[in-house]
Design a protein with these regions (language model features):
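N-terminal amphipathic alpha-helix/helix-capping segment at the start of soluble metabolic enzymes
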Residues: 1-18, 100-108
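Short alpha-helical segments and helix-capping/turn motifs at coil-helix boundaries
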Residues: 3-4, 24-32, 99-102, 130-134
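Conserved N-terminal beta1-alpha1 strand-loop-helix module at the mouth
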Residues: 12-44, 48-56, 60-71, 78-81, ...
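Active-site mouth loops of central-metabolism enzymes
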Residues: 13-27, 87-92, 116-132, 188-196, ...
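C-terminal extensions of enzymes
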Residues: 286-287, 293-378
Length: 378
């Protein structure tokens, strides 16, 4: 029997597949349904000290496209396939006091499953850092197995919250360190892809004591404009703000960010998110070095918590291990990270003639082209 279990940041998981912090994890009932369906872990909707008020109307929409009609739109069209999701939903609109007893009840119902509490506060002063600690202490005391720090929500108005933290290496380090000072459970930091160099922010989080990096959250994006009405396809009174793009469209970009971080920190722990709907996509993250993966968009489209998605993931995982049994692979750790080193600088990829390619520029003193790796064995 294939071994689905894994240990990630010291936490035992029945399987490496988690529902990410998002609308599917905004309620006790949804989280209980997710565990009943078979998910190895769930990350709660992000919890704050002060409840937010979301915009009126739809908080999320799905965009589709097709070969016959290739434009990307939120409009439902026959034969169109999923392209991406778009949302402008903020963090949980429930209080910390609302969440604490629910975390406790969920862990009592499923003690063998992993519940990670996603939390967020500001970062502008010492009081805000204490708010992070208050959230951390309350959630871990209620039974949360770990904490995920939301440094990545792309549409928080405050300049000291969400992705505005994730773009600032100093804040990444300071906030992580403050939470680690109060935490008795593992601390993960969830980073934004909307930064100049995600490796810099990852390094800052690790300096602050992070046990793992989660990447990535949604990419900042606007909804399409309807060519007939000239209005944004989702709006309130004609107005729109930047939201977050997720789903299949972000898979290649999220993999690129993950590859860079896994190469920079091969001995650290990473949880991959972005564009996962079956085991093939999850496998890509694991081969780069991820110890767990998280799912959102695909689950939202599958009864909110993805019962069929987790079945596909588990079946694909089992089949993959059975297929590679002769290679001696019995668990995720046997193949985690084995394609990490295949990602190289462009100049290191073989050219049809000669070995002296220098990147297309005149050789200057002090410049050294990257070493070309040996041909990869399949």
């Amino acid at each position: 029997m294939p071994d689905r279990t894994t240990t990630f940041t010291g936490i035992h998981f029945e399987n490496p597949f988690l529902l990410s912090s998002a609308p599917p994890t905004e309620s006790e009932s949804n989280i209980l349904r997710a565990f009943e369906a078979g998910w190895g872990g769930v990350v709660t909707k992000t919890i704050g000290l002060h409840p937010v008020v979301n915009v009126v109307g739809a908080k999320a929409k799905f965009m589709r496209t097709s070969c016959e009609d290739a434009y990307v739109s939120m409009k439902k069209r026959p034969g169109a396939a999923l392209h991406s999701s778009w949302n402008w939903e903020l963090i949980s609109d429930k209080t910390l006091d609302w969440w604490v007893p629910r975390i406790r009840r969920i862990k009592e119902a499923f003690p063998d499953r992993v519940l990670i509490a996603s939390i967020m506060a500001g970062s502008g002063n010492d009081k805000e850092l204490r708010n992070w600690q208050t959230l951390a202490e309350a959630c871990q005391d209620a039974g949360a197995d770990g904490l995920e720090l939301n440094f990545s929500c792309p549409h928080m108005d405050r300049k000291d919250m969400g992705s505005n933290i994730g773009k600032d290496e100093g804040l990444c380090s300071v906030v992580t360190e403050a939470v680690k000072d109060a935490a008795r459970v593992p601390v993960w930091t969830k980073l934004t892809p909307a930064t100049h160099d995600i490796v810099v922010e990852a390094a800052a989080c690790f300096r602050g004591g992070a046990d793992a990096i989660v990447s990535s959250n949604t990419f900042p994006a606007l909804p399409p404009i309807d060519p007939e009405t000239l209005e944004f396809e989702i709006n309130v009174d004609g107005l729109v703000s930047s939201g977050g793009l997720g789903g299949p469209a972000i898979l290649p970009m999220s993999l690129c960010n993950m590859a860079r971080m896994c190469q920079a920190f091969p001995d650290k722990s990473f949880s991959g998110i972005g564009g996962i709907s079956d085991f093939a996509q999850a496998l890509s993250y694991v081969l780069l070095g991820c110890g767990t993966v998280q799912v959102c968009t695909a689950a939202m489209l599958d009864q909110a918590v993805g019962p069929n998605v987790i079945k596909r993931l588990l079946a694909g995982f089992d089949l993959f291990l059975e297929h590679h049994a002769l290679d001696g692979w019995t668990s995720l750790e046997d193949f985690r990270g084995i394609r990490r080193d295949r990602v190289v600088p462009q100049s290191a990829v073989r050219r049809p003639a000669g070995d002296d390619y220098q990147g297309g520029y005149e050789i200057v003193e002090g410049y050294a082209a990257p070493d070309r790796p040996a041909a990869a064995k399949v």
